[in-house]
Design a protein with these regions (language model features):
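Start (N-cap) of specific transmembrane helices in multi-pass transporter permeases
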Residues: 90-102
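Alpha-helical transmembrane segments within multi-pass membrane transporters and channels
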Residues: 1-9, 154-158, 179
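Transmembrane alpha-helical segments in multi-pass inner-membrane proteins
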Residues: 99, 105, 116-178
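Alpha-helical transmembrane segments of multipass membrane proteins
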Residues: 15-16, 57-59, 106, 110-111, ...
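Hydrophobic/aromatic residues within transmembrane alpha-helices
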Residues: 12, 82-83, 136, 158
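Transmembrane helix-bundle core of multi-pass membrane transporters
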Residues: 3-67, 72, 93-95, 115-124, ...
Length: 179
């Protein structure tokens, strides 16, 4: 149900964005902000954004695999009744997990907007399903209780590299949608 509610909420906010800005594109962003997400460290080619991404991956890996909260979250995903039976506050755990998920989605939205210097109501439309497919490919169960940060990262990187390779080979967009 959480996934369905999340996608429904996405549709609600996307509709709200259409009402507020219509089909316009907002692109007046400070140069420092766009440079922060598009720049790289000297001639290394390593993007500035690699640092926060690596930090978030490590932080969430530690949270999920090395804390009682994380182990409880896996238990909750596996069986809500069993998690409650062993004393896990399932409502609190869900609220924290969904809040962190929303925060990360907001940061990703800000990144995407600054990366392409355009805020539009239909930015990245359809990307949510690609991301879900990538993390499922990485071993995460949409029903909960199974998965890992590293598996998710591998799934996202695999889908990203595949998509990039197909675009480099000039595969038509109509075919890319099928892949």
């Amino acid at each position: 149900p959480a996934l369905a509610v999340t996608i429904g909420t996405l549709a609600l906010y996307r509709g709200l964005a259409l009402v507020v800005i219509g089909d316009q594109s907002i692109s007046d962003f400070p140069k420092w902000a766009t440079s922060a997400v598009t720049g790289s460290f000297g001639s290394t080619g390593i993007p500035y954004m690699a640092i926060p991404v690596i930090l978030f991956v490590v932080l969430f890996w530690l949270l999920l695999h090395k804390t009682p909260y994380g182990r409880g979250l896996f238990a909750l995903g596996y069986s809500k009744q069993a998690a409650e039976f062993v004393g896990i506050d399932t409502k609190r755990s869900r609220v924290i997990a969904l809040t962190l998920s929303g925060l990360m989605a907001a940061l990703a939205g800000i990144y995407w907007t600054l990366r392409y210097s355009a805020a539009k109501a239909d930015n990245v439309e359809g990307l949510e399903l690609v991301v879900i497919a990538a993390v499922v490919f990485g071993g995460v169960s949409v029903f909960g209780g199974r998965g890992s940060i590293w598996g998710s990262v591998c799934g996202v990187l695999t889908i990203g590299v595949l998509n990039y390779a197909l675009r480099l080979n000039r595969i038509p967009e109509v075919i890319l949608v099928l892949v």
